[in-house]
From Swiss-Prot:
Protein source organism: Histophilus somni (strain 129Pt) (Haemophilus somnus)
Name of this chain's protein: Probable protein kinase UbiB
A UniProt-annotated Pfam family: ABC1
A single MF term (Gene Ontology): ATP binding
Major site of localization recorded for this protein: membrane
Length: 544
């Protein structure tokens, strides 16, 4: 262990102890070592005894720095793991950190481009436009030739961030591995899986080319759409630690007052947020999974026909056809209060084990979800529905589905945003036609022919081999059948032998007990028992 690792460990321990994070753990033999840490560092007192645990956890993560802040932000969306009061506190974590020097940013850009910044850009502002834990952005103008320029923003990765991330991830894995041993509920949290999911997201953010590729795909999916605009990426200037994109001007989606002053159709804007989300999920199978208010703006030029502008495409979610179908059918079944169908969908999708008891599963869904319908449909939260479904499924050993976790997080953002813009938004009324139409399209002849067409190249390649493959399969089947016959013969022989041995042993036991008690028993009874024992033994001996 290096000196820097020891220093980092001490800081983590110091922060956790000073905020009393250890005090939530139960007193048992597994937590004895943690209590020893508390005694060893006797000078690190809990300075926040009167504060709620959620607040202390948020403040501790805030003090530990960017990597822990981002972990807390991710955990705030995992309401299937944490009580609402803790998740709400973690949602308040801010990713704003002090910007690094503009001169260092310039050096990073020039190193990536392989030439002086002035060869490609003018008006480069060394003061960062915005700064976050992983990267910061600067404004400039890109030279397009013939005295033309285009306003752009340049996103630059923080220098030397990799070693800190590696060190923090290492300690996160160690802590996650300890949790199941420290308290009973630790197994339910599946902490190691959570850190694995977080690591994947974090590593994607460390390669800005991933964000570039995501933005290009989203832009293509919504090209010329009145609902969503994604800024253009300038691929020739994009590298692992630097990307260049079109600069946009818009009204922050959270600035409701400015949107209203601009004459924005708030009802249509809220409905379009829902439509954009479901279009990404069910049409494209590819959705922006970081749609919090800081990443969404509204085009100010079309208030009567409002258009969203999305930035920061570093985190995206992907769903396969199976996930989409099961998810859509589960939603429709839920709102039809068909809980057996919901339960069956989870099993058929492979989200829960195949041996799950459907009757128990259905009843669990009914008990948790039925109270939701005490509210009008317009007030039911889609995100809460999804959360309830996941919570029940986890009790039946549902494995963590990262794509569904991202979906639930994004839906939470979209729903909250929609109701902030237009409190009367009926999410189900907006989404149901979309889901129903999509499901109807999946069972039509057009889709069937489309799927067959997609399989044609595979069929053309493998059809000539089909007779040979079929013969091999038949031979294999014959061989397997012969093997099964042999196995059955051996099993039958073994069962006969076991039966024979049992009868022989019973006969010997009767004979032995009679011999042992011969003096204590009347002669007639002893003779009778000898005869019975001999006959039982003889039957066993004569058995095949």
């Amino acid at each position: 262990m290096k000196l820097n690792d020891i220093k980092r460990l001490y800081k983590i321990v110091r922060v956790f102890l000073s905020y009393g994070i250890d005090e939530i753990l139960p007193h048992n033999k597994y937590t004895r070592s943690i209590r020893c840490w508390r005694m060893l560092f006797f000078w690190l007192k809990n300075k926040h005894k009167n504060k709620a645990f959620g607040l202390c956890l948020r403040l501790a993560l805030q003090e530990l720095g960017p990597v822990w802040i981002k972990l807390g932000q991710m955990l705030s969306t995992r309401r299937d793991l944490f009580p609402a009061e803790i998740a709400d506190e973690l949602a308040l974590l801010q990713d704003n950190v002090e910007a690094f020097s503009g001169k260092i940013a310039r050096q990073q850009i020039e190193q990536a481009l392989g030439s002086s910044l002035e060869n490609w850009f003018t008006d480069f502002d060394e003061n960062a436009l915005a700064s976050a834990s992983i990267a910061q952005v600067h404004t400039a103008k890109l030279k397009l030739g013939e005295e033309q320029e285009k306003e752009v923003v340049i996103k630059v990765l923080r220098p030397n961030i990799q070693p800190q991330i590696e060190a923090d991830l290492s300690w996160m894995y160690k802590l996650a591995g300890l949790l199941p041993k420290l308290f009973r509920e630790g197994y339910r949290l599946r902490a190691v899986e959570v850190i694995q999911e977080y690591e994947k997201t974090l590593r994607d953010e460390l390669d800005l080319r991933v964000e570039m590729a995501n933005a290009i795909k989203l832009r293509e999916n919504f090209l010329d759409s009145p609902m969503l605009y994604i800024p253009k990426m300038y691929e020739a200037f994009c590298h692992k630690n630097v990307i260049v994109m079109e600069r946009i001007y818009g009204i922050p989606v959270s600035d409701v007052e400015t949107l209203q002053r601009n004459g924005t159709d708030m009802k249509l804007l809220a409905e379009r947020g829902v439509q954009v989300f479901f279009t990404q999920v069910f049409r494209d199978s590819f959705f922006h999974a970081d749609m919090h208010p800081g990443n969404i703006f509204v085009n100010p030029h079309y208030p009567e026909n409002p258009q969203y502008i999305g930035i920061d495409c570093g985190i995206v979610g992907k769903l396969n056809e199976s996930d989409k179908r099961y998810l859509a059918e589960s939603f429709v079944a839920f709102f039809n209060r068909d809980y057996r169908r919901v339960a069956q969908m989870h099993v058929d999708a492979g989200w829960t084990p195949q041996d799950t008891n459907i009757d128990d599963f259905e009843q669990a869904f009914r008990e948790v979800c039925e109270p939701i319908f005490a509210k009008p449909l317009s007030e039911i939260s889609f995100a809460q529905v999804l959360l309830n479904l996941f919570n029940v499924a986890r009790e039946f050993n549902m494995q963590v589905q990262p794509q569904l976790v991202l979906l639930q997080k994004t839906l939470l953002y979209i729903e909250g945003l929609g109701r902030q813009l237009y409190p009367q938004l009926d999410l189900w009324d907006t989404a149901k036609p979309f889901l129903q139409n999509w499901l109807n399209e999946q069972i039509g002849m057009k889709v069937t022919f489309k799927k067959l067409k997609a399989k044609l190249p595979y069929l053309q390649e493998h059809l000539p081999d089909f007779p040979e493959t079929l013969m091999d399969a038949l031979k294999q089947q014959k061989f397997i059948s012969q093997q099964l016959v042999e196995i059955n013969k051996k099993l039958a022989k073994q069962q006969r032998w076991q039966k024979k041995m049992f009868v022989l042993i019973v006969g010997i036991v009767i004979f032995s007990v009679t011999l042992w008690q011969f003096a204590a028993l009347p002669l007639a009874i002893s003779a009778g028992l000898f005869l019975v024992g001999f006959l039982v033994w003889l039957i066993g001996f004569l058995l095949p």
